[in-house]
Amino acid sequence: MKVKLIDHKGSVIGDHNINKEIVNHPINEQLVHQSIVTFQANQRQGTHKTKSRSEVRGGGRKPFSQKGTGRARAGTTRSPIWRGGGIVFGPQPRSYRKNLNKKMKTGALLSTLAFKLSEKKLIVLQDFNDTNKFSKTKDAKNLLDSLNVAKHSLLVLDGADNQSIRSTNNIDNITTLSSDLINASAVARSEYMIITKKGITNLIQNRLKLETKKEVKSKPEKTTKNKEETK
């Protein structure tokens, strides 16, 4: 499948071929959902904490005598039913960590990329060099305006291009990531995905490992003549 190749001014300069493994990959919505839930859960710090009756300051003295007052007996002012008392079954520090194996992560990422291709919302950008790169936020804003991507977009750049990544940090409705850090959650949350040629090459070779796979050649079957010769 071919997608349009865009230069840094927003003009179409050619086509870019996308691997058939990405185009023909089935879209597994359940796996994508599981990947997003795992990603969001791993972002949680889990540092929430409330104090129980044994941790609240004070309450060491018995507030009033056991008998003779007509009130319900009480041994401390830090009981959960008292104002300023401890919290019962409140949140405690915990880990929300979830795990996905490499095969599931790769499958979720392939599903989101295949969906973006089917919706024609994946744009391949010409590689940056010393003469055409995002040296200022203005340059990045002009490119996005020329592409007419008003909604939330994901810009994937080569990991070594730190200057271009910094130039897009102050633009609304755009998330910039290195091709080494791309994940299914970021792709699924974005309306458009813009990626450079180096970025998509790095993604295919290092993350998806599509071009490194070698076909296993089957051994030729022995014929009757070969069998007789071996005997």
Please describe what each predicted stretch is.
Residues 1-41, 45, 90-231:
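Extended polybasic, low-complexity segments that bind anionic RNA or targeting/receptor surfaces
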Residues 53-89:
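Glycine/serine-rich anion-binding loops at beta->alpha junctions
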